[in-house]
Amino acid sequence: MSKRYARQLHSADGLIAAVEQYGFLPFFRNEIHGFSIEELCPPELWFADDVDGPWEWKGPAARSGKCLYGKLFNKKAGFVSREWIPDFANFRRDGYDFDARWDDGLASYKDKELYEAIAGEGRMLSKRLKETLNYRKGGNTGFETCITRLQMQSYVCIADFVYMQDRYGRPYGWGVAEYATPEELFGYDLITSAYQRDSQESKERMMQHLSSILPGASAQQLTKILKG
């Protein structure tokens, strides 16, 4: 358990505050005990019908401008605070802007199509993205694999969730993810502000931070979280 944040979460603001204090926070439980939104959230709020819980909070948190959200940890959802986004992106991108990664033969054509579509639009709903690039029956396959990889590499993130509405204007169902680049949400200058550091230096900075708030976690466990 963290030394700095042990309170349970009861609101989107509380979730954002936890992300800002931890710096990095997976959505689901993992090898590090207590280091997840799932464990910080009271069980009765996890899938409550009559009150908002973490599934509803993730949208406001993602669009708050205070944290990065997406499939960031072991191909599963999580948050990174605004303070740590530059080092996180520098480490995960390993010194490559997406164009440079493509030029060096380190990205697939499908990844390139998805990245360019999102970057070109600014923001793009997953439904429209699939339609635009023919990810439908009889068309392209592997959408989830590609979009998850782009998030893990920090080239793409989730900006918000858009919900269907009933005839009374009330949202319902699972929200449709709206994708964007981190540069679109936080600005190019912030995202690239750690580029002058070696990617391993960014990793060490993040390791030191997490070690200070998760003293019971091993270096191997922290490395696994940061590498994804």
Regions found by a protein language model. Name each.
Residues 1-228:
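Long, low-complexity intrinsically disordered regions
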